[in-house]
Amino acid sequence: MAHVAEWKKKEVEELTNIIKSYPVIALVDVANVPAYPLSKMREKLRGKALLRVSRNTLIELAIKRAAQELGKPELEKLIDHIQGGAGILATEMNPFKLYKLLEESKTPAPAKPGVPVPRDVVIPAGPTSISPGPLVGEMQALGIPARIEKGKVSIQKDYTVLKAGEVITEQLARILNALGIEPLEVGLNLLAAYEDGIVYTPEVLAIDEEEYINLLQQAYMHAFNLSVNTAYPTSQTIEAIIQKAYLGAKNVAVEAGYITPETVEDIFGRALRAVLLIAQNLPEELLDEKTKELLNQQAQIAVATQPQQEEKVEEAEEEEEEEEASEEDALAGLGALFG
C-alpha cells in the first residue's frame, strides 16, 4: 500500500470541512491568473466567499468524502467539471450572484498567442499611433483595412479579427498589442457551482438580468389574468375578481332594466338617450320646451367634439398613406433583390 503524505491527508480533511460548511460550493479555474490579480480577488471576496486553491486530485477526494458524509451523492457531479488549475470557492451567496461578481471582477489583459478569446475582437476604425512599417503589411494580409494617413497607420472601418472562442495567433498578438487592444481577461473562471442538489454551469448562470425580469413580469401578468378570467381567487387577484363580477352583474341589470341604487342612473340615462333619438325625427311643434333644450345641448356637444374627430380621421389617413409608402418601398427593395 502506497504511503500517503500527511500534508495531503490534512489538506483533504480541511477541504472536506470547507465543503460541508457552506451551502454553495463552486469550482473555479485559477490556472492562468497571475499572483497579484489572484491576491486582489481574494481581497474582493473577503467576507463574501472563501477561496481555497489546491490540487485537482485532492479536491476530487474532498468532494467525494463530503458527499458521502453529508448524504448528498449529487454533490459528486461537481467532479465532472474539475479542469485546469481548480480551486474551491465556498460561499453563502447564490450561484447567480457569485457568477456575476466573478465576471465583474475580471480585468482586461494583453493578447497571448495560443489563447482563445472570450468574446469577439474588433479593431475600431480611426487613426492609430503606429508609424509606417512591416506591421501595415501584416494587417493587410489579415484583411484589416489599414493604410497610411498623415504619417501614421489608420484603420478605415471597424473590423472583426476574431470571433469568440477563436485562438490568437502570434501574428495577430503582435498587431493587437501594438494597437493597445487587450482581448483577454484576467480573473476567476467559474467552472460549476452546487446548491441544493443542483449543479449550475456558466451557460445557465450567464443570464441577461433585464430580459429575465421582463420574462418574470410577463409570466406574472399572464398568471394574474388567468386567475381573474377563471375566477380563481388569490390574495393578489381577489379584488380584481370582485370588481369584474360587480361590473358584469351591473351590466346585466342595466340591460334587463332591473332598477337598483347602483343601476338606476345608467338605466334612466340609457332611456333618455333612446327618447332623444326618437325626438330628433319628430316635427318640432310636437316637442315640449324641455325636450328641445335637451336636443339643443346634445347638438352643441356634437359640434364641440367634431373638430377632434376630424383631426383623428386626418391622422389616421396620414398613417395609412405612410404605411402604403413604406409597403411600396419594401416591395421595390424585394424587386431589386430578386431582379
From Swiss-Prot:
It comes from the Archaea. GO terms for cellular component: cytosolic large ribosomal subunit. The keyword Transport does not apply. GO terms for biological process: cytoplasmic translation; ribosomal large subunit assembly. Residues 305-339 are annotated as: Disordered. Keywords: Ribonucleoprotein, Ribosomal protein, RNA-binding, rRNA-binding. One of its GO terms (molecular function) is large ribosomal subunit rRNA binding. Residues 312-330 have a biased composition (Acidic residues). The keyword Hydrolase does not apply. Belongs to the universal ribosomal protein uL10 family. PANTHER family: 60S ACIDIC RIBOSOMAL PROTEIN P0, LARGE RIBOSOMAL SUBUNIT PROTEIN UL10. Forms part of the ribosomal stalk, playing a central role in the interaction of the ribosome with GTP-bound translation factors. Part of the 50S ribosomal subunit. Forms part of the ribosomal stalk which helps the ribosome interact with GTP-bound translation factors. Forms a heptameric L10(L12)2(L12)2(L12)2 complex, where L10 forms an elongated spine to which the L12 dimers bind in a sequential fashion. This is Large ribosomal subunit protein uL10. It comes from Thermococcus onnurineus (strain NA1). The lineage of its organism: Archaea, Methanobacteriati, Methanobacteriota, Thermococci, Thermococcales. The gene is rpl10.
